[in-house]
Structures are given as structure tokens and as C-alpha cells.
């Protein structure tokens, strides 16, 4: 997967297959390893949480064709950390050069940084090997009180997640007749599902550009959730962006791309997950994806317009999934990213199919 300017161009991968949900229903009926609860506000919203699935996951970054005349090369890579979706049991970094780890000041993402000086290698390969327990997501797993920084960033627009008169008008239409915060959030969620199509045939998808989403009504998961977040923030509902991968149900393989989702903040409950693009693909699961996540998400970073550490010379990073690289202060896109996984409770090998 190539990633110019820190933006992954690979397709976002399908989090789950329909067959999984058939198994899920059986598990709900017959296994004590699953728990389900419902909240009735306008409609029942099921939350399903799996007992932890343990996986090995390797994030491989390959930087190619570095110019030997460069004076300095900076490489920043997102690092997974323990959170709502996962518990990181081990995190082993394999790098041929020294590195440092810091947290970005706005979202607290863990960031690996490498600085190269002459002689500059032509190629650089860094691998991060994780062992993680995947938890699924429900609001109770998150601290219900956002920090002042979270409050600030969860309300303001970004370069691509804008709030303009068009977004405000759409939001007003979406929340009409809804009085509670969760009902207004559900109205926005339903609006996005009904006015967007999962369609990557028109160039420009994947940047999370709210204006493009409004004009075309098409895109991938990034575009769906950028529109949701812009509309939520237009209504003064705290909302944030998350990106990582969805680990398939196979025993092992290569994950073909990223997946992203959104969360909004419900006072007294916490951050509530939503996945509008998966709900569009599976309308029968729209209630499920408003308030729950598949227990196969592996999170890499939170937020948009990320300021790296040390700070990059270019613009804030729009989406931080692939490595971001600067050569003598200029963005450099000759990088390949691969994510491999293995279910530690199963054997075998399988390369997952591309996004659909």
C-alpha cells in the first residue's frame, strides 16, 4: 500500500463477512462467552462484546528509493497502544537504526520517529510486532470524562472535515424532530447512510473530504465518517475519528487495507462507536453499528490533522495510518505498508481478499 503525504491509498478492508454474523447469532444464543445489552432510546441498540480474541499483528513499513543526496530524512510511524478496542500485550520494534517514541500533543497517539543523516540508505525497513487482545467496543470501556484537549479537538473542524452552511443545513434536516443527544446523533448517522454510497469509482475518495462527500455522496469509510463527524460537530456533539485495521476471521493472512470509524460523546455514558459505512453495506445491521464495534478492530491512531513529534515541516497529517516521511523538509511517498496477522488460537495461513 502506498501512502503519499501520509494518506493511505489502499482500499479500506471489510471488517467482517456476513457469515460471521450468522455465527454471532448462534453464539449469542448458545455461548456464555458473549454478553449483550440494549439501551432503548427511540429504538433498541444492541451491544455485543466478545471475550478477547488474541492475535499477533505485524506492521511492516518499507521505505524505498531514498535519495543519497538527502541531508536529513524523517520517518514517523503510528504505534498501536492499549485502548477501547484492544489491550496491547507486547510491542516489539525491529529497526536497523535508532528510534524514539513520543506522544502527539493533541490526541496522545504513540509515534515512532526515526531521523536519518548521511550516509542515507537507499531502503529502510521497520517492523512492529504486536501481540494483542481484541476487545470489541462499548461505551463503558472508555473514561466517561473527556479531557479539555479532547473537548477542544472533538468540536472544531479540520482541513477536510469542514463545517459550512451546507453541512449545517444537512444537519438541521437530519435532526428534525429529535430532542435528545443520542437521538440527534442517530438522525445524523441515518442521514449519512441514506445519502452516501460506498463507491470508489470516482477519483478523490479516501481523503475524508466532507465537501466532496456532500457534492458527490460517494466514497469509502473515511468519507462516510468525515461527513458524520462534520455534521455531529455542527450540532455541537463531540465526535472523533479512529483508524486502524479490521482483522479478518481467518486464521492468518495479509490485511488488504485500513478501516476507520467514528465515535460521539454521550455524557454519563462515554464515547459511543458508530460505523456508517459498514451499516451501508449491511443495512440489516444498522442498529448494531450504532453503538457497537465488531470485536476485531485493531486501532492505530485517533484524530485528524495530527502534529507529529518532533513536528513535521509540512502540513498536519490528515490521516495517520501509513508512515509519514519527509526528505529535507518535503513530503516523500515512496513507502509500502503491509499488515499481517495471525490468530494465536488457530493455525494455518490465508491471504485475505481485497476490500469489497
Residue ranges and their predicted role:
Residues 68, 119-124, 179, 233-235, ...:
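A short, structured loop/turn motif at beta-sheet edges
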Residues 293-356:
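Low-complexity, Gly/Ser/Thr/Pro-rich intrinsically disordered linker/tail segments
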Amino acid at each position: 500500500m502506498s501512502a503519499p503525504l501520509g494518506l493511505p491509498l489502499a482500499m479500506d478492508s471489510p471488517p467482517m463477512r456476513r457469515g460471521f454474523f450468522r455465527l454471532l447469532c448462534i453464539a449469542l444464543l448458545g455461548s456464555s462467552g458473549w454478553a449483550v445489552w440494549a439501551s432503548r432510546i427511540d429504538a433498541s441498540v444492541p451491544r455485543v462484546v466478545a471475550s478477547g480474541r488474541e492475535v499477533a499483528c505485524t506492521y511492516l513499513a518499507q521505505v524505498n528509493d531514498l535519495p543519497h543526496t538527502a541531508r536529513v530524512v524523517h520517518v514517523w510511524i503510528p504505534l498501536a497502544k492499549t485502548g477501547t478496542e484492544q489491550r496491547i500485550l507486547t510491542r516489539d520494534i525491529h529497526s536497523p537504526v535508532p528510534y524514539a517514541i513520543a506522544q502527539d500533543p493533541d490526541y496522545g497517539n504513540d509515534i515512532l520517529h526515526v531521523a536519518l543523516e548521511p550516509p542515507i540508505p537507499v531502503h529502510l525497513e521497520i517492523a512492529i510486532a504486536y501481540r494483542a487482545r481484541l476487545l470489541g467496543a462499548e461505551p463503558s470501556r472508555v473514561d466517561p470524562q473527556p479531557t479539555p484537549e479532547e473537548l477542544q479537538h472533538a468540536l472544531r473542524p479540520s482541513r477536510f472535515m469542514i463545517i459550512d452552511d451546507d453541512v449545517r443545513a444537512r444537519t438541521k434536516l437530519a435532526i428534525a424532530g429529535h430532542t435528545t443527544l443520542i437521538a440527534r446523533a442517530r438522525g445524523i448517522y441515518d442521514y449519512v447512510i441514506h445519502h452516501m454510497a460506498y463507491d470508489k469509482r470516482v477519483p478523490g475518495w479516501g481523503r475524508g473530504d466532507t465537501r466532496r462527500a456532500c457534492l458527490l455522496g460517494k466514497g469509502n469509510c473515511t468519507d462516510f465518517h468525515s461527513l458524520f463527524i462534520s455534521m455531529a460537530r455542527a450540532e455541537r456533539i463531540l465526535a472523533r475519528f479512529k483508524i486502524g485495521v479490521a482483522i479478518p476471521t481467518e486464521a492468518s493472512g495479509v490485511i488488504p487495507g485500513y478501516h476507520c470509524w467514528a465515535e460521539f460523546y454521550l455524557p454519563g455514558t462515554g464515547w459511543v462507536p458508530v460505523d456508517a459505512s459498514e451499516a451501508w453495506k449491511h443495512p440489516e445491521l444498522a442498529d448494531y453499528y450504532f453503538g457497537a464495534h465488531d470485536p476485531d478492530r485493531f486501532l492505530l491512531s485517533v484524530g485528524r490533522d495530527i502534529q507529529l513529534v518532533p513536528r513535521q515541516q509540512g502540513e498536519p497529517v490528515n490521516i495517520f495510518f501509513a508512515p509519514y516521511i519527509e526528505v529535507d523538509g518535503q513530503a516523500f511517498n515512496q513507502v509500502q505498508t503491509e499488515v499481517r496477522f495471525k490468530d494465536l488460537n488457530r493455525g494455518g495461513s490465508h491471504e485475505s481478499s481485497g476490500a469489497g
